[in-house]
Amino acid sequence: MSNLGIKEIKVPSNLNLDKQQDTLIIKGDFGQVNYEIDSRFSLDLMENGSLKFYPKKNLVLSERKKIKALWGTQYSLLKNYIQGMSQGYKKTLELVGVGFRVSLIENDLVLKLGYSHEVHFNIPSDIVIQCPSPDKIVIFGICKQKVNEVVSLIQSLKKIDLYKGKGILLENTKLRLKEGKKK
């Protein structure tokens, strides 16, 4: 049994759910998402406005072990989609370093990171990026996985220097600086 999968998923009142065969259509303030339900799982819409997610009973023994491993993962993915459609996911990055700047030009994020050239980052269509100040980037989206992927891609443009404390950091991240060589 999965500790997560047993729990019911509470659906906020601002979302509309519609089940069509193996697809759950989630409509909310931020648009619409189609979640493909694995054919080995069942999904029930409860009367109290929650979802019950469980594996089908008529599975072969060898399949049951695989399903138990996937149950919690599928539950978490569905819960993340529901939370994303109701509230969304937001992460803030800070550029720490002398001369590190960011600007937004149409669908490109232009970063000055101490290189001899500017770095251009193409923004995916389902992600919204804002630059409230020249050293902050706010990333917003409905898919938690996509938001975290974009955050890590932007952070990979400039490796964090643990000796000087420079780089692209998540907001409120405290770096423990390393000591340099001593004579």
Feature locations, PLM:
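Ribosome-associated RNA-binding proteins
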Residues: 1-183
